[in-house]
Amino acid sequence: MRDALTVFHPMSNPRTASSKLIADADIDSVTALTQAFRATYRRELQQRSDGPSAEACLWAAAHASRELLAERWIRTQAQDRANTTARRVHYLSMEFLMGRALGNAVAALGLEDELRAALEAAGQSLPDVLEREADAALGNGGLGRLAACFLDSFATLGLPSFGYGVRYQYGMFAQQIAGGRQGETPDDWLKRGNPWEIHRPELHYFVSFGGRVE
């Protein structure tokens, strides 16, 4: 039996910024991003003694962007439910190679300049923070890239859709060169956590496998 996870990827952790900062409809997106970023960043710094870091800024920026995306997602779901003729696409795939999420999320929100300014105020640059994010190792082949392209197309066309897959801990191999030879080691992409996930322990699903082991 597996717990459910919701992943916002253009869309838990105690470092999540307060969603109340985003819920107020009178706050525009620019102000919301800045306030949510600062709130999460302060929570990060409470756990640190060495000052600002790209890692802390990554978590702050990801959570701030996720909250804004979540508000859009909630409104979209409400509109779809109100439209009784709307159908949904449920896309199942063993792999999803979505790439790094923060850059896509900020671009979708149209807030790159605002995030860049917030990071510079914290002594960090946007390229350095984006580089800190690990690629989501949820597969290693063309099937995963194709699935990601389908989801991007659904979003571009405005089609109500969800992607369902497997949350691999070691979905890829990390390549290393030692003694002039190439070697592979498991890519533990979750070792620092994933700011885009929302753990949902109240939901459980039985996963069955056919066949037998000899």
Task: Describe each region flagged by the PLM.
Residues 5-214:
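A conserved ligand/cofactor-binding region detector
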